[in-house]
Amino acid sequence: MSKIADDQNFNDEEENFAKLFKKELEKEETLEKGTIKEGLVVSINENDGYAMVSVGGKTEGRLALNEITDEKGQLLYQKNDPIIVHVSEKGEHPSVSYKKAISQQKIQAKIEELGENYENAIIEGKIVGKNKGGYIVESQGVEYFLSRSHSSLKNDANHIGKRVKACIIRVDKENHSINISRKRFFEVNDKRQLEVSKELLEATEPVLGVVRQITPFGIFVEAKGIEGLVHYSEISHKGPVNPEKYYKEGDEVYVKAIAYDAEKRRLSLSIKATIEDPWEEIQDKLKPGYAIKVVVSNIEHYGVFVDIGNDIEGFLHVSEISWDKNVSHPNNYLSVGQEIDVKIIDIDPKNRRLRVSLKQLTNRPFDVFESKHQVGDVLEGKVATLTDFGAFLNLGGVDGLLHNHDAFWDKDKKCKDHYKIGDVIKVKILKINKKDKKISLSAKHLVTSPTEEFAQKHKTDSVIQGKVVSIKDFGVFINADGIDVLIKNEDLNPLKKDEIKIGQEITCVVVAIEKSNNKVRASVHRLERKKEKEELQAFNTSDDKMTLGDILKEKL
């Protein structure tokens, strides 16, 4: 081959190479920033968290793996899988994004859906991002741009996660963006809200709405495109209720408009206005004294609220739960959701109040006790309460009082010093007071009293000895055979009271034994008379030779 031919071939190859190179350059130049391309996953680097995606020719883009990873951490795409990506930068290794591609496709679909008549169309979404110019709002998977000047939001606050409503004001097909405005929404909505509110107020039939938000003071319901507040007192005929127990976001509910504040642009709605007033219905169906079945709906320390049905709630006061006076808390007897039978004790339709009783459907424990026991019966009771004056014993449904002076023969003893809560004591019924529903008990009457023991050893007019244990204004007490014996002031003669000392031994004669009152009285004065009487008797029966003078000499 000649040199000329070789040169020609070289020139042809160079020309062909140049053409091919130019075509490749043209291909790369068509890969503009912001383009959506169908690429191919060519490699996955899990350690560094990225995948390389071929987007045409020799160009490969870097894709973050977190964009194609599900909630469980599993990759949605594998090597050699086709994938749609958004090209964020030009060059040999541009940045690509799967999420942006999907988002841009959704935006484009929304733009086509809106058509030409998009202006002032209302969207509701959540703020998911923020940039220098404003906020990104997401609604049904589509991202919208809310500029700061159209946001009506405070610049110094964090609004991420906040739900907003806005009007569409601009659509950019080339840049795949939709601009929205809260400022425009308020302008459009205020006018529309006034018109629709008037329409709702004039409506005679309930309107179907959707629960949009639940708060402690009520629920916001959207009806005919505008929102109104159903105050918690307008939810049920029961009165104020907890909104969260009745509804959740997204629930459909019928409402009626009851007021509109034009100055504050607030629409008030009511749910209970759409329901027939049950209080009018029950006036002819329920009467005091009727027994009805109810369900416990709420428990407080002061009583229980019960659901009667038909949106009516009754109140069971804590004192009407049990005949037991020691009801510490209603939840010790009842639980929410429990079905019980109660007796109606009062109906007040005007004030929407209905009171019921649980205990009045059972026999009064006192009446049951009275039918089974009588005065004098001996039984056991458990100490329920201790006081300064005695102890209350539980006798099985009723309490009886064991007073200190009926518990011990020793008047200085007290129940609280000798018993504890839960002790079981054998007692005797002293009294059953039907009028006041009270029971008096005694423990001391089941044991022999000190006076009875004393009476077994001593009779009236017998002589006893004892030491002085106390001196009172009315007399002196001596202890004789384990019992305190009273010597009144008038019975001390010939002893002088002001000369008597504690511990002094006194001889006297028994003048009275009161077993029922556990009292013994004695007299020194009567002892002297007794001695004189005995001496006189001795004189009358003595030898005639003994004279009265002799007797007197002996005394002297």
Curated annotation (Swiss-Prot):
Gene Ontology MF, one: structural constituent of ribosome
Swiss-Prot/TrEMBL GO biological process terms: translation
A Pfam family hit: S1
Annotated keywords: Repeat, Ribonucleoprotein, Ribosomal protein, RNA-binding
Assigned GO CC terms: cytosolic small ribosomal subunit
Cross-referenced InterPro entries: NA-bd_OB-fold (IPR012340), Ribos_protein_bS1-like (IPR050437), Ribosomal_bS1 (IPR000110), Ribosomal_protein_S1-like (IPR035104), S1_domain (IPR003029)
Highest taxon of the lineage: Bacteria
Coiled-coil ranges from the UniProt annotation: none
Domain S1 motif per the UniProt entry, residue ranges: 35-105, 120-183, 204-272, 289-359, 377-444, 461-525
Family membership: Belongs to the bacterial ribosomal protein bS1 family.
Function (record text): Binds mRNA; thus facilitating recognition of the initiation point. It is needed to translate mRNA with a short Shine-Dalgarno (SD) purine-rich sequence.
Protein name: Small ribosomal subunit protein bS1
Organism, scientific name: Helicobacter pylori (strain ATCC 700392 / 26695)
Lineage: Bacteria, Pseudomonadati, Campylobacterota, Epsilonproteobacteria, Campylobacterales
